[in-house]
Amino acid sequence: MGRGLMDQRSCGSSGKFSVCCWLGTAVFLPLLISQSWATQRKPGDQDASRRRLDRQTIQLGTGARVEFSQFHSAALDSDREYSIFLPSTYGSGSKFYPVVYFLHGLWNDHTSWTVDRYGDLHEMIDKMIGEKKIPEILMVHPRGDNSFYTNFVDGHQNYEDYITSDLIQQIEKTYRAKSGRQWRVIGGTSMGGFGALKIAFKRKDLFSATAAHSPIVLPKDPSLITANGQNSERIEFFTKLMAPIFGNPIDPVRWHENDPLSLARVLDLKGLRIYFDYGTADRYNQMIGLGEGIRALDEVLTQRGVPHVFVEHPNEPHGWELVSQHLADSLSFLCRDFEN
């Protein structure tokens, strides 16, 4: 496949494949997390919890709008916020719409996609609809904290169930959202890309397509992350952050049950449309070899004969910055089978 060019990957010859062992260094996710904190926490963005509650409806000139709301999640036993894009025709008539669910990354929240420094993505979506590049859709951004959209070991903070059960029910009972997997797709960026892939892989009964920008593809053997004493402060921070999700020490079984690369090796993914991309200038390529992990996912899917789209963008960055440049590509892919 030509790098940087969209390519529909289909069947390939089977063969033995292994993840590069260097991914299991002691600095994999500790560095990811510490660098995410540094890059995501910027001036004017310190009090995320207050911002969640203060946001008012964003009204666009076309009549489209973004609403901010919350509901009680049984899976989390707490109230959770979300934002939703409603197209210009939503305010009149009785039309029902397909739904795109989109998951944010570490230290972001459900409001991040609407702020200037991330490209005012709601305006991009509205423009794409106006130009008939995608059909009219609802687009939902749930607050996911730093959960990797995974059920916690305590059995009470069940973030995967929150997305796959509570959120879908909330949207379909509150808004004119079409039900059924053919009308639901899921995307995300960074940690949210991880969540979108793994949820779609596990629950293709709920979602017909998935798209992930700069997805965090986890290392093969999580026990190697804390195998030595280097970067002890970062390891301690990582351990505390990830312990509720994967246990302390990390439970390899739970890890592989949620790792997109591991899931891609064993699950039947045929019938699920899959798109993912990353930039060769992604800050995590040098730090943790993110590009290697993503290319490994491409290779596994190809070897298993699972059709998918994989795009490598030359000299482009990580996360929302990449999304702002290529959301049109992923949305066009996700919405391809929706009725206009």
Each language-model region and where it sits:
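Intrinsically disordered, low-complexity regions enriched in Ser/Pro/Gly/Gln/His and often acidic
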Residues: 13-16, 30, 248
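Intrinsic low-complexity/disordered segments
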Residues: 2-5, 32, 37, 101
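Non-catalytic cap/lid and distal C-terminal segments of serine-dependent acyl enzymes
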Residues: 36-340
